[in-house]
Amino acid sequence: MAASVEHDSLESMEAPQTAVEVEETKTFKDLGVTDVLCEACDQLGWTKPTKIQIEAIPLALQGRDIIGLAETGSGKTGAFALPILNALLETPQRLFALVLTPTRELAFQISEQFEALGSSIGVQCAVIVGGIDSMSQSLALAKKPHIVIATPGRLIDHLENTKGFNLRALKYLVMDEADRILNMDFETEVDKILKVIPRDRKTFLFSATMTKKVQKLQRAALKNPVKCAVSSKYQTVEKLQQYYLFIPSKFKDTYLVYILNELAGNSFMIFCSTCNNTQRTALLLRNLGFTAIPLHGQMSQSKRLGSLNKFKAKARSILLATDVASRGLDIPHVDVVVNFDIPTHSKDYIHRVGRTARAGRSGKAITFVTQYDVELFQRIEHLIGKKLPVFPTQDDEVMMLTERVTEAQRFARMELREHGEKKKRSREDVGDNDDTEGAIGVRNKVAGGKMKKRKGR
């Protein structure tokens, strides 16, 4: 009898730092995953399990409740999807599992992974999120899918108003990005959901950080859980090269264009603090010939998914986003993250830069620091426990870009104004004219299109 795994207190299964040799020999079959799902992993290119999967999957297959703490990009979705599908194969049932997520985009992404892993066994998923017609979701729920992936608010709406829909037979509950769910003030909704699902269930809670709110939720929702932690409290991955640039705020646009030219050929994710600045900067870059596309909360759901898919398909090399896009999204080819606007909350820095250097790859993160951001930047350095180096620039070359950037700024402001007026007239969502791709005429006025790097560099 393994007494060490059976006592009542929260246990810790820290991943040993010296276990590299063991990890290299582990396969999904070694973890106890059934053959048909191992084949699905092979087809998805999952050659070997990640650290969090090695820690969590065997315990989940034993029927334990799990708290998974792992850095962004660590394979968390596979860590809960594989045990759930394994159990579904053994005891097939409709409305078998519920996955709660903080954002719509993450919900669709999790659904894609469940459907890909379960394609050979006919797994059916329903995504229940805001911004999409409730009636079509009600019809999807009436078909009783195996897996429901939902944001808490819209799920409560269906539990209260959709006739015949309930989760009384649910076997698995997953809360993914639990810290973000709670930070978005979904606590009331989560409490309501916990009251209408069976107590006799398995619960997996995954979070990048173990906040006080997450600890409180863990006590309310999990029974004798085991903790699988593969990262320190606040950690950025080892292969991430982190830099900062201290610049006057009026030159931020110019330095951004310089960096995009210097690192041309890479894919970029650029974080802005507001929807308006995301849209403005996307227009600015488009006017200069860059393949930039925005993703923010004022865009319609279809436009947000469209932007995301264009970027994932490499049809666009630059994605400008607010923090709505900074957590959980599996975009495998981001080479460089730029914090164009420094995050107000230091923890958001961890999640933003977690878009690059994922699953063993290397990447860069560059944070713009203006005269107004020094205190916020110092908090970030304190949180991650290191002083960041300056990203090298040639200031004279940056200043040579000023005239053209200024002209592009002017046209971007004009387009934003025109769009605002059109929105008032037609009451369209700001994202429905998204996306800056209609700015061809304006772009042609900005001499020369995309800037060329100077010869000899």
From Swiss-Prot:
The lineage of its organism: Eukaryota, Metazoa, Chordata, Craniata, Vertebrata. Its EC number is 3.6.4.13. Keywords: Acetylation, Apoptosis, ATP-binding, Helicase, Hydrolase, mRNA processing, mRNA splicing, Nucleotide-binding, Nucleus, Phosphoprotein, RNA-binding, rRNA processing. One of its GO terms (molecular function) is RNA helicase activity. It holds the Pfam family DEAD. It catalyses: ATP + H2O = ADP + phosphate + H(+). Residues 239-399 form the Helicase C-terminal domain. The modification Phosphothreonine is found at residue 151. It comes from Bos taurus (Bovine). GO terms for cellular component: nucleolus; nucleus. The modification Phosphoserine is found at residues 9, 426. Its main location: nucleus. A motif (Q motif) lies at residues 26-54. It is found in: Nucleus, Nucleolus. This is Probable ATP-dependent RNA helicase DDX47. A motif (DEAD box) lies at residues 176-179. Belongs to the DEAD box helicase family. DDX47/RRP3 subfamily. PANTHER family: ATP-DEPENDENT RNA HELICASE RHLE-RELATED (PTHR47959), RNA HELICASE (PTHR47959:SF20). Involved in apoptosis. May have a role in rRNA processing and mRNA splicing. Associates with pre-rRNA precursors. Interacts with AGO1 and AGO2. Interacts with GABARAP. Interacts with NOL8; the interaction is RNA-dependent.
